[in-house]
Amino acid sequence: MAEPLTVSPELTANYAYFFDLDGTLAEIKPHPDQVVVPHKILQLLDRLAAHNAGALALISGRSMTELDALAKPFRFPLAGVHGAERRDINGKTHIVRLPEAVVREVEALLRSTLVALPGTELESKGMAFALHYRQAPEHEAALLALAQHVTQHWPQLALQPGKCVVEIKPKGTNKGEAIAAFMQEAPFAGRIPVFVGDDLTDEAGFGVVNHAGGISVKVGVGATQAAWRLESVPDVWRWLEQINYPQQEQQVMNNRRDGYESFSRSI
């Protein structure tokens, strides 16, 4: 069981930071286009990266184009579409591609099927697809069955359930593999990985970080293999501030009576 995270890592330690975005750095909204990362949080991320030789990356199911737009004016190393696309510290991209015919056929099937499922939404990511049902939770089972059908018919694809979404992505891509790839490269190599995420899609990342002796942090409720837990997105924001300004940590700890439980075990 994940324990409440109660002590922020020291800036002098040799850490590499990885953050999911939706539900971790930004509150989840009814539609993905409504999500915003507060500018102050982006500034904290940039400061944290600077204190760690640039060893900070965003790891998300969103595309890298979306991540760059949400992170403006800052530019971080990224893994988008659950690791199907990745950009390293030098700006070099690594992209998993599917045959164009497969993409066309899958997208056509999904679009035609979703017409009969009002309230659902198809998001095409080029090499992956997201079937959203936040506005129509009654269609969850139908979308899972549809995704299972697709992955059985096209074995190069894999199903990834998430929060009010079912993802169809290239087989073998996940956030854990993306983190592992970053950890083989400068400036991440040789550091202790820290990964913060909130969803089922983040569990592969937690597994890789745990195996490396790092710090895995689950945001919110639910079963997880993460070792630590923060209750909400605002708690992540406060934790980021503590990491960046450790001299203020004691004051924050003294203000927990507002309902924020800080950290309960030393990292």
From Swiss-Prot:
Substrate binds at residues 20-22. The active site is at 20 (nucleophile). InterPro entries: HAD-like_sf (IPR036412), HAD-SF_hydro_IIB (IPR006379), HAD_sf (IPR023214), OTSB-like (IPR044651), Trehalose_PPase (IPR003337). It comes from the Bacteria. The keyword Manganese does not apply. The keyword Calcium does not apply. One of its GO terms (biological process) is trehalose biosynthetic process. Mg(2+) binds at residues 20, 22, 198. GO terms for molecular function: magnesium ion binding; trehalose-phosphatase activity. Pathway: Glycan biosynthesis; trehalose biosynthesis. CDD domains: HAD_TPP. Its EC number is 3.1.3.12. Belongs to the trehalose phosphatase family. Removes the phosphate from trehalose 6-phosphate to produce free trehalose. This is Trehalose-phosphate phosphatase.
